[in-house]
């Protein structure tokens, strides 16, 4: 699981509001249950609902803080559905009682049920759902946010595999590129990316045309040990022949899962690099 960070909760208004309300509602139901249990007979079943819901709330805090809601969304929806049944039955057992402590506990469970319904609608929907996209747009850090919005405007070559200063950029033959080749080793930038003339002079220089020395050519990986599934559709940048397009739900073979760009191969044999935040490992 990814590292837990409180900024994922504090930077997400939806998560911060719903988690805060759920904790408050649970405290009301818990304290009301304790008082009611001291004053009069109290249904033991309600304690199970109290214990179950604190576990569910804790799980949602962990998943939200680690930004893995896409990975565990189905499991969360299942647990929340069971929790909705438990809280509803607890309300039915308490709300009609004359004791104010039981009614207070019932009010806490009613508020919990309302939050659970909202959570089910959120976690049970796909990331492409309009309401979820709207909610996620307010979050500062969110898994699966559009890569196009986070792509650097100046130069993004530094994060791609095989394009650092210390090693030659990744090369492809004409047969591998299927007619998408360009005359520049760095696609879209004749003579290299902007500012390349100011880089370390010890870096390898590449010709802008003609024959390229085969010793500088980086061979494509022969093994693709990982399987990944596309959670979004992606259209390759037409100015970069190294990228590949794929559709949502398509399964790809991946050779390396380090970095923001993964070397991938489609079912039709097409190879190239794909943004990692558009894929999920199987």
UniProtKB/Swiss-Prot annotation:
Membrane topology of this protein: Multi-pass membrane protein
Extracellular topological segments: 36-44, 96-103
Pfam families: SH3_1
Membrane-spanning residues: 15-35, 45-65, 75-95, 104-124
InterPro entries membership: SH3-like_dom_sf (IPR036028), SH3_domain (IPR001452), Sho1_SH3 (IPR035522)
Protein origin, superkingdom: Eukaryota
SUPFAM superfamilies: SH3-domain
Single Gene Ontology BP annotation: regulation of actin filament polymerization
Keywords: Cell membrane, Membrane, SH3 domain, Stress response, Transmembrane, Transmembrane helix
Compartments (UniProt record): Cell membrane
Domain SH3 per the UniProt entry, residue ranges: 223-282
Biased composition annotated in UniProt, kind: Polar residues: 146-182, 201-220
Ranges where the record places region Disordered: 144-220
Gene Ontology CC terms, in alphabetical order: plasma membrane
Cytoplasmic side: 1-14, 66-74, 125-282
Function of the molecule: Plasma membrane osmosensor that activates the high osmolarity glycerol (HOG) MAPK signaling pathway in response to high osmolarity.
Subunit comment: Forms homooligomers.
Family: Belongs to the SHO1 family.
Name used for this protein in its record: High osmolarity signaling protein sho1
Native source organism of the sequence: Talaromyces marneffei (strain ATCC 18224 / CBS 334.59 / QM 7333)
